[in-house]
């Protein structure tokens, strides 16, 4: 089904003459004011599923443009693959019924009509949508069918290395683990309530939905871009320090490439499809494709192993189901740190798996997510577990907390072992962050080989590793963690190294603005992001605004501070909702404190004008 959506001051049409395909109609036409007009072509293969998705697409646009009236206008000129008249009329009536929560008008099918329309001309006033049914439905069903063939057995591996059936485990004291287990077993991914981080990302002017793009695509304001860039730089550096070689690969690939086609047939997924001049391409949903093709044309010997390559994909694309998309948690375009390790044998693969597990713990901890902030899941085939029981049990020693084990009766996926660190948010939804998999299939599929010490070519094992998970999801986890801080009576905040403004200097009056600017400049020379609230507002409002922005350090400057050389500094991390922690310190002491908290982290300068009076508002 093809849709052309026009937000109009008015739409009027007049019925002239019927065709042999016309549905019964005894009116002359109508005029509708303040209306979203949906010019609609019903295509071959469209069904009730397509109608529901079309209604959802129309509803989404109507809500964005605040339209209360919708006109469905049959328009054959949007497609060359039209459904028959009987089907078209039936589905158009169903579309009308699906949108019954609006005031709906439907122009008759099969009549020659004259029409006039006045398009409003704003950025969302002219949009098109192409609604597919069969392909996505087939992919979704294929995924479900394959998943249903694999039988899962659920256990908890205790710190004492006892494997306990989930039903028999005592979750007392492990409430987050209980929520995670329930979420995993229920497999209910749809979002019914907006999670707290969505309000935070908007209020802090970090990010927001882009209404002119597809669902699940985000725009980042200067503050959000800074946070995201710092995370990208930090994660990339950790992978390179670990020994990975950074590469870059294309974002789209030929759907009919022999190797890639076999992979997509084996593991169907929801992809964006791009039509080229002569070929169809799919947008990557991971860096695997490009990195594996690169490795397949490389000369590798046992001396090179373990070999690690890394790419930060900006972006990877996956057409997640619309009902699962929300904020930064689940997107259709996302930034994924993707490292692949080539290992000569299973022993080397297990060693790397263990090391990358520890690396992932370290990366999340340095970002600002402690082990108590997430739950661990290990997914494994029964055969691999039986053969490597001691190794699997050793994983619990790293964090010394119970972990969820999903054990499959046989292998369907390309891996035999996988771990995930999952963040459970305020709505009890779980999202995977760090993950590592041992892949036993793709080296052969892609023709990746290495020359062993005996001179023979062999297929290696491959580890897939994302030490943090998608960067957007890390931001989501940090913001959701802030909500938990609020629930505990603390003040929500980002880690100091990620805070867009680390220190705000507030003059008590206009007379002290110049002094505040000088102090801010002195602090900023130490590689610290400092701004000055020079607005003509009361001191109380300036302090409240700084608190609303989660500024880690708020320094007030007045006569007393200038004379003493000591600033009155509010320390957010040590404050509570009931009491503000205020200390006196010099500008040098403040700079040293901030610098020590950010040691070893990347730095970027302030992304906005230093003076608040010069800043635009992105809300």
UniProtKB/Swiss-Prot annotation:
Binding locations of Zn(2+): 288, 340, 464
Location within or outside the cell: Cytoplasm
Cofactor binding note from Swiss-Prot or TrEMBL: Binds 1 zinc ion per subunit.
PROSITE patterns assigned: AA_TRNA_LIGASE_II
UniProt GO molecular function: ATP binding; threonine-tRNA ligase activity; tRNA binding; zinc ion binding
Modes of activity regulation: Not inhibited by 1 uM borrelidin (BN); probably does not bind BN.
UniProt enzyme class: ligase
KW Ligase (keyword) present: yes
Cofactor(s) listed in the protein's UniProt record: Zn(2+)
Keywords (A to Z) from UniProt: Aminoacyl-tRNA synthetase, ATP-binding, Cytoplasm, Ligase, Metal-binding, Nucleotide-binding, Protein biosynthesis, RNA-binding, tRNA-binding, Zinc
BP GO annotations: threonyl-tRNA aminoacylation
Record-linked PANTHER family: THREONINE--TRNA LIGASE, CHLOROPLASTIC_MITOCHONDRIAL 2, THREONINE-TRNA LIGASE
Annotated HAMAP family: Thr_tRNA_synth (MF_00184)
Family of the protein in this entry: Belongs to the class-II aminoacyl-tRNA synthetase family.
Quaternary state and interactors: Homodimer.
Described purpose of this protein according to its UniProt entry: Catalyzes the attachment of threonine to tRNA(Thr) in a two-step reaction: L-threonine is first activated by ATP to form Thr-AMP and then transferred to the acceptor end of tRNA(Thr). Also edits incorrectly charged L-seryl-tRNA(Thr).
NCBIfam families, per the entry: PRK03991.1 (NF003068), thrS (TIGR00418)
Protein name: Threonine--tRNA ligase
Gene: thrS
